[in-house]
Regions:
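Phosphate-end processing signature that detects enzymes handling 5′-triphosphorylated RNA
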Residues: 1-226
Length: 226
C-alpha cells in the first residue's frame, strides 16, 4: 500500500476557558460579521500514539499514531514533529507527514516497512539504529479522544477556514492518568494573501483575550501533563 504524502495547512490552536459561553460568543461575534459561517456538524476521533516507553521516536522528531474518525475510517500517520525540527537537520523540502488508510482492527505493527520508508524519506542516513527493532518495542503510550463541532468560515477576500471547537481528553495508556481540555482549532484551507490568516489569528486573540494560544502539539501537551 502506497504512502500518501501530505503538507500541513496553517493553523492556530487555543485553550478555551469556558466552552459553553465562549463558543457561541465567537461564532456570533463581530469578528465573523464579514464571513459566511456554515455548520459542518459534529465528529469524534481517537488518536493512539505508539512509541517505546522512553519515547525514542518522539525524541527524534517522529510521531507515529493511528487516527479513527467516527469509529470507522482509520489511518496510520507518520508525522514529523515541528517542535523537534530546530534540533534536527531535516531536509528543507520534507513533507509534514505521511498517512496510510488501514483497517479498523489494524495497528502500526502490520506496517513496519511503510513506517521505515517514511522515516528514510526524511532521514536518508537513517537513525543510526536498527529501526525495525525499535518499532517492535513500540506500544500505545498516549491516547487522545476528541469530540468536535466544526464550522466553515469564508469571506469574499479569499480567506477560507475551518473553526473547530474540541473537547480533548488525553490519557496515558500505561499510567492510566487522564485530563481534558476544551480547545479551538482554526485551520486555513485557502487564502490569497497569507498575511490575511495571520491577521485573523491576531484579531481572535485581541477580541477574545481569555483564549490562550497552545504552542505545543497534542503529544507534547499529553507528555507534559500526564
Amino acid at each position: 500500500m502506497e504512502l500518501i504524502q501530505v503538507t500541513n495547512l496553517a493553523n492556530g490552536r487555543y485553550l478555551i476557558a469556558n466552552m459553553k459561553n465562549d463558543k457561541p460568543a465567537i461564532i456570533r461575534s463581530e469578528l465573523l460579521n464579514s464571513f459566511a459561517v456554515g455548520a459542518l456538524g459534529s465528529s469524534y476521533n481517537e488518536k493512539v500514539y505508539f512509541d517505546t516507553p522512553d519515547f525514542f521516536f518522539a525524541e527524534k522528531g517522529i510521531n507515529i499514531y493511528t487516527v479513527t474518525i467516527n469509529g470507522s475510517a482509520k489511518e496510520l500517520v507518520i508525522r514529523y514533529d515541528s517542535e523537534q525540527v530546530r534540533r534536527i537537520e531535516f531536509l528543507k523540502n520534507m513533507p509534514n507527514y505521511f498517512k496510510l488508510p488501514i483497517k479498523k482492527d489494524e495497528t502500526m505493527h502490520k506496517y513496519y516497512n511503510e513506517i521505515i520508508e517514511a522515516i528514510y524519506r526524511v532521514f536518508p542516513a537513517g537513525l543510526n539504529v536498527n529501526i525495525e527493532d525499535y518499532l517492535r518495542q513500540c506500544s500505545p503510550q498516549i491516547k487522545v479522544m476528541k469530540k468536535r463541532e466544526s464550522f466553515r468560515v469564508v469571506n469574499n477576500t479569499g480567506l477560507k477556514m475551518v473553526m473547530s471547537f474540541d473537547i480533548c481528553e488525553y490519557a496515558n495508556v500505561a499510567k492510566r492518568g487522564k485530563f481534558s481540555q476544551p480547545t479551538l482549532d482554526i485551520v486555513c484551507e485557502s487564502v490569497r494573501n497569507p498575511d490575511d490568516f495571520k491577521i485573523f489569528l491576531k484579531t481572535v486573540i485581541r477580541d477574545f483575550p481569555q483564549l490562550i494560544k497552545i504552542e505545543s502539539n497534542e503529544l507534547t501537551v499529553a507528555r507534559n501533563n500526564l
